[in-house]
């Protein structure tokens, strides 16, 4: 009897057990700068949409929204905030998104909602390698002590960023370095800060980098929130005044976009074997494509494929390879050695050692390609089986 064995789709698992580590190329990185935007007076009640672009012209929209509580004034230095303005600039003189005002009193909890300004950037889809630069986190006695807290979210989990000043301090060890106008958490008295927070401890004039923080996330996120307040009164302080900080630049990478197909074809091109007759061989081809502009982290792709019940796996050299499978890596950068394949005789555990030649006891195969799969690339894996 002549019969066709359908190519059942293989199962594909992308393992994200660790934070994303394979950065995308500069050409695939999305960049946005408020310095390139027209000066504008904004409103805390509104949501604004901006477009980040790659050097190749691809665009990715994101939104900026605000939640405020306890502001008695939204004027800082003669500028109504929020605003895209040169009132508060970067060290190179560029415009920033200036956020602030005057609170009715000091902030008691930066993670709460009282006397806090929360600025949220929402990207709509998961992105990776997000980096944001903020400016002018500082302190003036009896007026303000800037207090910020930064968190990221993927919609389910909350993440802590890496926070670094130009002077070497970070939120792993915390503390203050010379010239820096701020202290990063984690710290204890007198500033009780977590590693998501920073406070101003000295003056930083607009246009300097003394109050700068570079913020980045290892984990993929869909949104980031920067919370801003005025740290509780210390050292005899009695009053509260106007304050502001700036946001200048945002950069991020797209996620990988993995797709997979499986096909089958007779190994023979002539004779009865080309009709998938019993005793003839079938070649199965699994194609994996990364259509995204970001690479797939090394050794995180796992493919499992169940053989049809009428097929016997061929455990012999698949020419020109010396293994029972053939990898065509293309430009993907992945490799696949004999040790990266395993076999199952029950479809559940992959500890079975196949017999030489055609082995009907092989019920499923597992392939674990090694290396980082490049952006915008594909590879194929082929193996063969005999029709019973």
Feature-to-residue mapping (PLM):
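Sec-dependent, cleavable N-terminal signal peptides
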Residues: 1-23
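N-terminal targeting leaders for non-cytosolic proteins
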Residues: 23-112, 151, 155-194
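Terminal, low-complexity interaction segments
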Residues: 24, 30-34, 157-256
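Extracellular beta-rich ligand/substrate-recognition surface
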Residues: 98-115, 199-208, 372-373
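Short, flexible beta-strand-to-coil junctions
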Residues: 102-104, 135-141, 229-232
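Low-complexity, serine/threonine/proline/glycine-rich extracellular segments that form mucin-like
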Residues: 111, 116-117, 121-154, 159-163, ...
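Extracellular beta-strand-rich recognition modules
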Residues: 130-134, 223-229, 379-381
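Exported/extracytosolic protein signature
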Residues: 255-388
